UniProtKB/Swiss-Prot annotation:
Similarity comment: family membership: Belongs to the acylphosphatase family.
Physiological role: Its physiological role is not yet clear.
Domain Acylphosphatase-like residues, every copy: 13-103
Active-site residues from the entry: 28, 46
Pfam families for this protein: Acylphosphatase
PTM annotation (N-acetylserine): residues: 2
This enzyme's EC code(s): 3.6.1.7
Top enzyme class: hydrolase
Name under which the protein is recorded: Acylphosphatase-2
PANTHER family on file: ACYLPHOSPHATASE (PTHR10029), ACYLPHOSPHATASE-2 (PTHR10029:SF20)
Cell membrane is among the record's keywords: no
Superkingdom, natural source: Eukaryota
Amino acid sequence: MSTLGKAPGALKSVDYEVFGRVQGVCFRMYTEEEARKLGVVGWVKNTSQGTVTGQVQGPEDKVNAMKSWLTKVGSPSSRIDRTNFSNEKEISKLDFSGFSTRY
């Protein structure tokens, strides 16, 4: 087996922050629901700056699908201006057993 490239099913972790009208519009609830549908783990929470922040972990294709959702979809009443992603990296194991809302 080649050590070059990524192993099939490689796990990925990424932090995110979503800007726009994302508080008071059930954004966290919909984020949690979408994460469970996709089978990714992590967390989501509101910030005092009016943004939503969190972390997503899982198979690379599922994390990429969640990144797309956090950038383009959101909750029905939200308005996403931009989403910043940081600390994107490959991981050897998941740090969470599910997806939760933090307060």
